[in-house]
C-alpha cells in the first residue's frame, strides 16, 4: 500500500526569482551605495557614543503605494538635510507586516492587495523603491521577518528592526548576527526587556545556520556577529518610555554587560495604539533629552502624508498617502516632531 505523507496541506508551490536576477536588474548605484554606507557609519558612531545626534527612524507603518512613499521620501529628505546637525533621519520603509492573527502581510507578500500573492512582483517593487529612495540621498530602514527576503533588499537598508513577536526567535537572532546594518530588537509584546537583552547578546555572537545564496541555492551561512545591536522600547502591558522606565532598562543593560543605549518607539503600546499619543511620547522624550539623558540614542515614529489609517476591507477607494495598517501621524505633526526633537538635542548639548 502506498502512503502519501508529504505536502498534504500544500495547495501550490511557485518558483521564486533568485536574488541575483533582481540585483542585476536593479543594481545599487554609486549614490545609493554611498547613502547606505554613510548612514550605517553614522548610526554606528551614534551607538558608540561618538556622535551625539539622535537617530530618528520615521515613516509609514507599511508601504502599500510606492508613489505616495516617494512623495513622502522627498519631503523627508528636505527635513533630513535641514536638521542633519542634530538628527540622523532614516525613512521607515516597511514592506512586510507581522500579523498577530491574519491580514494583509505587506507589499512584498501581496503587492496588489487582492490576495493574489505575486511575491516576485512584490520583490521587484520593493527593491526598485528602495533604490530610488537611497539614490535621492535618503537612507532607509526595514524590518526583517524571514531568512530569504534580506538577500533581495538588505544591501539597501541602513538600519533594521526585529519586531516584538520575533525578538525571542532563534532564527531572527541568527539572521541579525549576519546583517551588515545596525539592528534594533524590540522588547517583548508583554513589555519584558530580558528577551531583547538576550537577543542583543545572541546576535553579537557568531552563528551557523541555513539560508539561501544570491543564486537561490540552499546554503550553510556562518556569521561573525553583529556588534551594532540595541534595544527598542515599544511598551507592553503599559507604556515604557518614561524616565523611570529608561533608568530601569539602563540598569538591566549594565547588569548584562551591554552599553546603556535605548531607542524609544513612540507608537505601538507606548501610544496605546492611539496615533495622536505619539506626540505625547515625543514631549516626554524631548524633556528627557533636555534634562541631559545620554542613553536615549534613537526614536521610532509612525508617520505618513495623511494622518490616521483606512481599512482595505471597506470597499471604499483608498485615500492617497494614508496608512492601510497602523494609524500614523500626518505630515504637519511629522514636521513639528522632528523640529522638536532637533531642538531637544541642541539643548542636551548644553
What residue ranges belong to the model's regions?
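Glycine-rich loop at the start of a catalytic domain that most often binds anionic cofactors/ligands
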Residues: 66-78, 101-109
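Gly-rich Lys/Arg/Thr-decorated short loops/hinges at beta-loop-alpha junctions or inter-strand turns
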Residues: 18-27, 223-235, 318
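Acidic (Asp/Glu)-rich catalytic clusters
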Residues: 47-50, 78-84, 128-137, 222-223, ...
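Conserved, mostly hydrophobic/aromatic
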Residues: 59, 264, 330
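Active-site-facing alpha/beta catalytic cores
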Residues: 2-6, 86-241, 245-246, 268-269, ...
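Conserved phosphate/anionic-ligand binding catalytic regions in large, soluble enzymes, centered on
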Residues: 55-68, 326
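N- or domain-start disorder-to-order transition segments that initiate the globular core
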Residues: 8-48
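Internal helix-turn-beta structural module
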Residues: 304-347
Amino acid at each position: 500500500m502506498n502512503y502519501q505523507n508529504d505536502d498534504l496541506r500544500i495547495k501550490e508551490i511557485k518558483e521564486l526569482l533568485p536574488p541575483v536576477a533582481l540585483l542585476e536588474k536593479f543594481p545599487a548605484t554609486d549614490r545609493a551605495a554611498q547613502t547606505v554606507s554613510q548612514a550605517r557609519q553614522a548610526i554606528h558612531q551614534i551607538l558608540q557614543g561618538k556622535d551625539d545626534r539622535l537617530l530618528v527612524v520615521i515613516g509609514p507603518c507599511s508601504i502599500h503605494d510606492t508613489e505616495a512613499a516617494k512623495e513622502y521620501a522627498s519631503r523627508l529628505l528636505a527635513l533630513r538635510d535641514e536638521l542633519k546637525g542634530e538628527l540622523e533621519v532614516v525613512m521607515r520603509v516597511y514592506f512586510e507586516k507581522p500579523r498577530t492573527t491574519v491580514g494583509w502581510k505587506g507589499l512584498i507578500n501581496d503587492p496588489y492587495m487582492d490576495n493574489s500573492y505575486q511575491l516576485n512582483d512584490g520583490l521587484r517593487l520593493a527593491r526598485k523603491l528602495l533604490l530610488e529612495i537611497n539614490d535621492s540621498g535618503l537612507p532607509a530602514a526595514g524590518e526583517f521577518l524571514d531568512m530569504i527576503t534580506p538577500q533581495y533588499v538588505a544591501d539597501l537598508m541602513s538600519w533594521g528592526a526585529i519586531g516584538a513577536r520575533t525578538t525571542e526567535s532563534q532564527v531572527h537572532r541568527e539572521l541579525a548576527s549576519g546583517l551588515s546594518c545596525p539592528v534594533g530588537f524590540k522588547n517583548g509584546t508583554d513589555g519584558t526587556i530580558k528577551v531583547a537583552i538576550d537577543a542583543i547578546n545572541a546576535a553579537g555572537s557568531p552563528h551557523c545556520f541555513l539560508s539561501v545564496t544570491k543564486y537561490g541555492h540552499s546554503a550553510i551561512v556562518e556569521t561573525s556577529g553583529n556588534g551594532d545591536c540595541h534595544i527598542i522600547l515599544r511598551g507592553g502591558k503599559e507604556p515604557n518610555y518614561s524616565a523611570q522606565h529608561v533608568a530601569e532598562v539602563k540598569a538591566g543593560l549594565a547588569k548584562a554587560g551591554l552599553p546603556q543605549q535605548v531607542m524609544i518607539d513612540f507608537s505601538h503600546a507606548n501610544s496605546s495604539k492611539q496615533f495622536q499619543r505619539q506626540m505625547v511620547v515625543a514631549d516626554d522624550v524631548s524633556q528627557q533629552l533636555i534634562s541631559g539623558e545620554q542613553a536615549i540614542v534613537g526614536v521610532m515614529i509612525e508617520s505618513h502624508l495623511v494622518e490616521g489609517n483606512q481599512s482595505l476591507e471597506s470597499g471604499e477607494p483608498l485615500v492617497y498617502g494614508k496608512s492601510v495598517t497602523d494609524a500614523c501621524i500626518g505630515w504637519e505633526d511629522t514636521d513639528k516632531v522632528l523640529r522638536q526633537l532637533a531642538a531637544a538635542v541642541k539643548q542636551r548639548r548644553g
